[in-house]
Amino acid sequence: MNATKFVVLLVIGILCAIVTARQVEEVSKETKLGTSLPKSTNKGIGAQLSAAGLTYSGSSVSSSASAFNNPKGPGASASESGYTSTIGQVIAKGRKARVSSASASAATGEAAAAVTRKAAAARAKGKVASASRVKGSSEKKKKDHKGKKD
């Protein structure tokens, strides 16, 4: 999208917001941002604030090793697998809602095989780590009416 199209769409969006916004005696933060609220909800707007967070972290590892010396001679095999998963969800409502969620996962694997009689060897390793973090906050700040005349 070039700059001209962006500016045109921005102007159209602002004009639509101005045309559709209703006048409210006490202007709330939400109204200043472009949404319109009925006059009856201005005093209890703090109850509508909320914050939500979701985090997921998953890990998987698989290791396999194999060594054979045939016909019908020595053979070796080794296998390793692992999986970890963490999921967190936090939803908070209220005046000072805070959200914090953390998640971490780790999986390690190691496999080894060895054969004698003319030698055969195999080795496999695997390591996985995963992390996730979510933060959030919601608070309606009090208006400062100092020095203002009604």
From Swiss-Prot:
GO terms for cellular component: apoplast. The keyword Transmembrane does not apply. Residues 57-82, 119-150 are annotated as: Disordered. Keywords: Signal. It comes from the Eukaryota. Residues 57-67, 119-135 have a biased composition (Low complexity). One of its GO terms (biological process) is mucilage biosynthetic process. Residues 1-21 form the signal peptide. Belongs to the UPF0540 family. This is UPF0540 protein At1g62060.
